């Protein structure tokens, strides 16, 4: 079986940690592609296209540690709370995820225990090794969804705990012409 997530080791002592929750479109064989066609698994609904490369490159540039998810967000969305209705999505951008419909509590628990919990334990283990970590989560987005309008921003900057650092980061990005929301 493929690793549930990949850890990137730091090349120097730095508080920076970069990760990608949606870096993979992989679905283990036992889930029969969740009833989807291969073309659906190549679309943005299955993963954040390009984020694995971005996480790896940023970790290399900054010599920092990181983590990359190894399963598709359609199997279980590692960027959602356990209580979120979108944890195991039944629809994404107009596409029905057939094998996620009427999921038994046992099947849900199995995905949580086998993918969600180990992934988050891995992040917590990495963060526990850092003093005052600065954490960046990498996501990508599609300029236009099948069921939506065009998005007008180049980048989103979401802040959970450290607004001053995020503001400095935003100011630095704007020097390069990035249009932020």
Predicted regions and their residues:
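N-terminal catalytic or cofactor-binding beta/alpha core of small enzyme domains
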Residues: 1-135, 140-181
């Amino acid at each position: 079986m493929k690793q549930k997530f990949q850890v990137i080791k730091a090349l120097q002592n730095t508080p920076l940690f970069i990760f990608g929750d949606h870096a993979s479109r992989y679905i283990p064989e036992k889930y029969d592609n969740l009833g989807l066609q291969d073309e659906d698994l190549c679309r943005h609904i299955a993963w954040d296209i390009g984020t694995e490369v971005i996480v790896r490159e940023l970790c290399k540039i900054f010599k920092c540690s990181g983590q990359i998810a190894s399963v598709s967000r359609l199997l279980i969305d590692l960027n959602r709370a356990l209580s979120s209705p979108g944890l195991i999505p039944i629809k994404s951008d107009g596409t029905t995820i057939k094998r996620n419909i009427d999921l038994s509590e046992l099947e849900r628990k199995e995905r949580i225990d086998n993918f969600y919990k180990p992934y988050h334990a891995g992040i917590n283990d990495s963060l526990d090794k850092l003093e005052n970590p600065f954490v960046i989560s990498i996501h990508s987005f599609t300029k236009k969804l099948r069921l939506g309008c065009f998005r007008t921003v180049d980048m989103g900057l979401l802040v959970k705990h450290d607004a001053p650092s995020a503001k400095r980061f935003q100011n630095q990005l704007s020097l390069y012409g990035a249009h932020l929301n």
